[in-house]
């Protein structure tokens, strides 16, 4: 079994853990509707993705 040769310092441990934090979600403004949506995701209200109709749009009640 592998064993560390040297003790990891608190600084090195903290630098390694700095990438573990959660990042906030990224949103882009839709060109057609102006609403915010996730990049590279289908707009569920219109059913459009990259200018193509992928899903049938939901009817608003």
From Swiss-Prot:
One of its GO terms (cellular component) is large ribosomal subunit. Residues 1-16 have a biased composition (Basic residues). The keyword Transferase does not apply. GO terms for molecular function: structural constituent of ribosome. One of its GO terms (biological process) is translation. It comes from the Bacteria. NCBIfam families: rpmF_bact (TIGR01031). Belongs to the bacterial ribosomal protein bL32 family. Keywords: Ribonucleoprotein, Ribosomal protein. This is Large ribosomal subunit protein bL32. InterPro entries: Ribosomal_bL32, Ribosomal_bL32_bact, Ribosomal_zn-bd. Residues 1-35 are annotated as: Disordered.
């Amino acid at each position: 079994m592998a064993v560390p040769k040297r003790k990891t310092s608190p600084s090195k441990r903290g630098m390694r853990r700095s990438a573990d934090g959660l990042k906030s979600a990224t949103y882009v403004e839709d060109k057609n509707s102006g609403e915010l949506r996730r990049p590279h995701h289908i707009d569920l209200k219109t059913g459009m993705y990259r200018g193509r109709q992928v899903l049938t749009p939901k009817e608003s009640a």
